[in-house]
Curated annotation (Swiss-Prot):
SMART domains: EFh. Ca(2+) 3 binds at D244, D246, D248, K250, E255. Belongs to the CREC family. Residues 1-29 form the signal peptide. It comes from Xenopus tropicalis (Western clawed frog). It is found in: Golgi apparatus lumen. May regulate calcium-dependent activities in the endoplasmic reticulum lumen or post-ER compartment. Ca(2+) 4 binds at D289, N291, D293, E300. This is 45 kDa calcium-binding protein. One of its GO terms (cellular component) is Golgi lumen. The keyword Isomerase does not apply. Glycans are attached at N33. Ca(2+) 5 binds at D325, N327, D329, H331, E336. Ca(2+) 1 binds at D109, N111, D113, Q115, E120.
C-alpha cells in the first residue's frame, strides 16, 4: 500500500515538473517585453512617458488659454503661487498652508505696509510667469536630448517623427528603416492627423533661414509656443481656426461660447455646460474683447494670450484684487487673501478667521 502511494506521489510530482517546464518554455518563447508585440509594425505601448516628453503639452502654465481653446482654470493659482502650486493641496494641514500663504503675502508686499497694491501684484505675477518660463526651459533641455540622441544639437523632422511614433508604440528601428527606404508606414488615421498637425507646427518653429532642423531653442518654441512671438501667433491662428464658424478669422461671442462637440445628457452635464458658457462669456466681454466692439480679432487674442504682456499682468492684478477686496480699498490685506484662499491657491483654508489673529 505504501509503495503504491509512493508511486502515485512520484507520478504526480513528475506531472507537475513537466507542466512547469512547458510553462517556462512558453514564457521564454514570448517576446521579452510587452512592447515587442506588433500589429502591422506597431508595438503595444506600455506607458506614455516617452510621449509626454516629446509631445507639445495641452496645458501651458501661466497662459490664460489651453492649446485647445479652453480657458485655463488654474491660471490665477499659477501666477500667484508659481512653482509652489503643487504644495497647496486640499489634504494638506490647514495651519501649514496658512503659514505658506502668509509667507507669500510678505514677499508680494514689497514696501511692507501690510497690504498688496495692484502694482505689487503685477510685479509678482510677472515674476511667477518668468518662473514658469524657466521651468519650461529646464525641462526642454531633457526633452531635447530625448529626440537628439547623437547630440549634434539639431533634430530633423524625420528624427522627431521616429521618436514620436516609437512613443506611440511603433517599432523604432522598423520606422527608421522604412523612412530611410521611402517605404509606406501603416499609420492609423488618428495618428496621421496628429502627425500632420505636428509637422505644420514643426516648420513654424523653424526660424529663418529655414533649414528644416530644430535646435534646442527652436524645439522649446515647438513645445511651448508662449516662448516665441511667432509661435504664439501660430497658436492663436490654430485656436481661431477651431472656433471660427463663418471663416472670417475673427471670433464673435456666440462662436467663442459655443459648447464643445457632444450633447447634454443629464442635469450634471447641463450644469457643466452652463458653467462653460458663463465663464467664457465673462472672459470674452470683460477681458479678451479689448475695445468692446463685440468682435475678437487675432491681434486681440494674441495680446490676451501673451503671458509676458505687462499690461495684461496689471489688469490681472486688478481683477485678482477685486475678487477679495471686501473693504473696497483697492488693496489686499492678509486676512482678505486667507478668506479667499480657494481663489488664490485652489485650496480652501478652513477656520481662517478664528486662527488668523492667533498665528499672525
Amino acid at each position: 500500500m505504501v509503495s503504491k502511494q509512493a508511486f502515485l506521489f512520484s507520478l504526480g510530482s513528475l506531472y507537475l515538473s513537466l507542466l512547469f517546464v512547458f510553462l517556462l518554455m512558453d514564457v521564454y518563447a514570448r517576446p521579452a517585453n510587452n512592447s515587442a508585440l506588433k500589429v502591422e509594425g506597431k508595438e503595444k505601448a506600455t506607458d506614455n512617458k516617452d510621449e509626454n516628453e516629446i509631445m507639445p503639452p495641452d496645458h501651458l502654465n501661466g497662459v490664460k488659454m489651453e492649446m485647445d481653446g479652453h480657458l485655463n482654470k488654474e491660471f490665477h493659482q499659477e501666477v500667484f503661487l508659481g512653482k509652489e502650486i503643487e504644495e497647496f493641496d486640499e489634504d494638506s494641514e490647514p495651519r501649514r498652508n496658512r503659514r505658506k500663504l502668509a509667507a507669500i503675502f510678505a514677499k508680494v508686499d514689497r514696501n511692507e505696509d501690510k497690504q498688496i497694491s495692484a502694482n505689487e501684484m503685477q510685479r509678482w505675477i510677472m515674476e511667477k510667469t518668468e518662473e514658469h518660463f524657466q521651468e519650461a526651459v529646464n525641462e526642454n533641455k531633457l526633452h531635447f536630448r530625448a529626440v537628439d540622441p547623437d547630440g549634434d544639437g539639431h533634430v530633423s523632422w524625420d528624427e522627431y517623427k521616429i521618436k514620436f511614433l516609437a512613443s506611440k508604440g511603433f517599432n523604432e528601428k522598423e520606422v527608421a528603416e522604412k523612412l530611410k527606404n521611402n517605404e509606406d508606414l501603416k499609420i492609423d488615421e488618428e495618428t496621421q492627423e496628429v502627425l500632420d498637425n505636428l509637422k505644420d507646427r514643426w516648420f513654424q518653429a523653424d526660424n529663418p533661414p529655414a533649414d528644416q532642423l530644430l535646435n534646442e531653442e527652436e524645439f522649446l518654441s515647438f513645445l511651448h509656443p508662449e516662448h516665441s512671438q511667432g509661435m504664439l501667433k501660430f497658436m492663436v491662428k490654430e485656436i481661431i481656426r477651431d472656433l471660427d464658424q463663418d471663416g472670417d478669422k475673427k471670433l464673435t461671442l456666440s462662436e467663442f461660447i459655443s459648447l464643445p462637440v457632444g450633447t447634454v445628457e443629464n442635469q450634471q452635464a447641463q450644469d457643466i455646460d452652463d458653467d462653460w458658457v458663463r465663464d467664457r462669456k465673462k472672459e470674452y466681454e470683460e477681458v479678451i474683447d479689448a475695445n468692446h466692439d463685440g468682435i475678437v480679432t487675432m491681434e486681440e487674442l494674441e495680446e490676451y494670450m501673451d503671458p509676458m504682456n505687462e499690461y495684461n499682468a496689471l489688469n490681472e492684478a486688478k481683477q485678482m484684487i477685486a475678487v477679495a477686496d471686501e473693504n473696497q480699498d483697492h488693496h489686499l490685506s492678509l486676512e482678505e487673501i486667507l478668506k479667499y484662499s480657494e481663489y488664490f491657491t485652489g485650496s480652501k483654508l478652513m477656520d481662517y478667521a478664528r486662527n488668523v489673529h492667533e498665528e499672525f
